């Protein structure tokens, strides 16, 4: 691999090429399990570039009659080299209120592209496709196959990537094109959802001493659980209720958020079908490497049993992972050595594309999980990388999603370089 060869590839990624595909993608609404039109657009584009394209039908994990589709583009190598998957999702985040521009207008002004999915994650898919297109146009030959996989339903726990794996799609290496401010996330948190149900017999304002002794309002039971775990988004201190080893690249983690609490009352409209004797709490922990489902379950059981010893009326039921999240929002943390060839190749690509020193570590994806977690858990060494930085917003998900075109172009060139270096 010579400098002239890689310079020739990088030069074939142009602002106009990236902007045109990015704007076309933003203008196609593609909410989760409604990605068919954008899937067809990307499939046709990749086919025109010269990739072999297969369309994979994906069934909704909770609604068997609902289906969507995702393309698998393959640039076939000559053989004898490692294969690389470029993975990004076609479904953007939640469309929040408060947009000041048309979320599907793909406005381009002052170097910024605006719209739903501008960097989460249509921009990532666009950068991947444009990077591979540059390799094809350069005439370079690769030994290993390159798979370009725009997937559906990331926002449904990575259902599209899980469907890829179930379909037998594999690669030796993968880059998950998630927004990371063009930093290389070789380490990322994981996620596990936890469900706790508390119970108590109903008690009215006139009662016996025995009945009162056996009663603890289920909401108040949940309040005690919340108190002992601590405030949402506060770092969980080492040596406390949760067992873990802090990771130097994931400061402030593990941490958690309390997501939902449900309690019914027999005199009020029932929204959940639950009995008024019970209260449900759902919360999530963003985990660090080394933590396991079994370890977290043991920690939670110890915390809850501690409450029971102090309050005999405490009555709980614990599920980890929460029912319905086992094959979605239950993802292991990932940690790839900085010396891994995937990391070093992409770092050199970022250096060449940007002219600046690359940043490797957890910073750009701090707190996020991506489909890269799923790929890595399936045995495919993966990093997460892409344009866009959610720290520029006051909230996330957000209105007015936007990304600098220059960052998308840099990402496309960095990926083109890494792909050529790894697969040539």
Task: Give the location of each predicted region.
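Fold-level recognition of mixed alpha/beta catalytic cores in primary-metabolism enzymes, strongest
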Residues: 119, 123-231, 399-416
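Metal-dependent amide/peptide-bond hydrolase catalytic core
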Residues: 1-4, 199-424
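Short, solvent-exposed loop/turn segments at the edges of secondary structure
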Residues: 68, 101, 189-193, 274-278
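Short glycine-aspartate micro-motif
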Residues: 83-85, 113, 170-176, 193-195, ...
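Acidic/His- and Gly-rich active-site-bordering loop/insert found
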Residues: 2-114, 137, 141-142
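Phosphate-handling active-site elements
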Residues: 97-98, 109-111, 131-147, 232-239, ...
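Short, solvent-exposed loop/turn elements at beta->coil junctions and helix N-caps
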Residues: 57-62, 180-182, 243-247, 364
């Amino acid at each position: 691999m010579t400098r002239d060869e890689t310079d020739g590839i990088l030069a074939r990624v142009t602002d106009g090429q990236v902007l045109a595909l990015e704007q076309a993608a933003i203008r196609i609404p593609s909410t989760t399990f409604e990605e068919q039109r954008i899937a067809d657009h990307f499939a046709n584009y990749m086919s025109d570039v010269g990739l072999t394209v297969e369309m994979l039908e994906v069934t909704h994990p909770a609604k068997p009659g609902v289906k969507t589709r995702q393309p698998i583009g393959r640039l076939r190598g000559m053989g004898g080299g490692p294969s690389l998957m470029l993975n990004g999702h076609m479904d953007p985040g939640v469309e929040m209120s408060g947009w000041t521009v048309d979320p599907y207008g793909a406005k381009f002004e002052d170097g910024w592209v605006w719209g739903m999915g501008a960097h989460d994650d249509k921009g990532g898919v666009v950068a991947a496709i444009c990077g591979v297109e540059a390799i094809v146009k350069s005439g370079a030959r690769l030994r290993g196959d390159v798979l370009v996989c725009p997937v559906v339903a990331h926002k449904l726990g990575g259902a599209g990537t899980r469907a890829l794996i179930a379909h037998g799609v594999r690669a030796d290496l993968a880059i998950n094109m998630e927004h990371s401010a063009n930093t290389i996330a070789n380490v990322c948190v994981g996620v596990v959802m936890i469900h706790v149900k508390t119970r108590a017999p109903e008690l009215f304002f006139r009662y016996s001493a025995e009945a009162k002794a056996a009663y603890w309002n289920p909401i108040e039971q949940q309040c005690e659980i919340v108190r002992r775990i601590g405030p949402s988004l506060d770092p969980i201190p080492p040596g406390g209720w949760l067992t873990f080893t802090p990771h130097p690249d994931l400061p402030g983690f593990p941490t958690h958020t309390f997501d939902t609490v449900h309690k019914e009352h027999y005199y009020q409209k029932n929204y959940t079908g639950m009995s008024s004797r019970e209260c449900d709490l759902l919360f999530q922990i963003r985990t660090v490497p080394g933590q396991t489902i079994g370890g977290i379950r043991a920690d939670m059981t110890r915390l809850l049993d501690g409450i029971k010893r102090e309050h005999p009326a405490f009555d709980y039921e614990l599920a980890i992972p929460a029912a319905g999240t086992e094959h979605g929002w239950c993802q292991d943390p990932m940690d790839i050595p900085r010396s891994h060839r995937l990391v070093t190749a992409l770092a050199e690509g970022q250096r060449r594309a940007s002219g600046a020193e690359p940043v490797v570590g957890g910073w750009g994806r701090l707190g996020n999980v991506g489909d890269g977690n799923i790929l890595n858990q399936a045995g495919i060494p993966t990093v997460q990388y892409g344009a866009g930085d959610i720290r520029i917003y006051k909230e996330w998900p957000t209105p007015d999603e936007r990304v600098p075109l220059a960052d998308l172009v840099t990402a496309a060139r960095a990926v083109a370089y890494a792909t050529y270096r790894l697969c040539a």
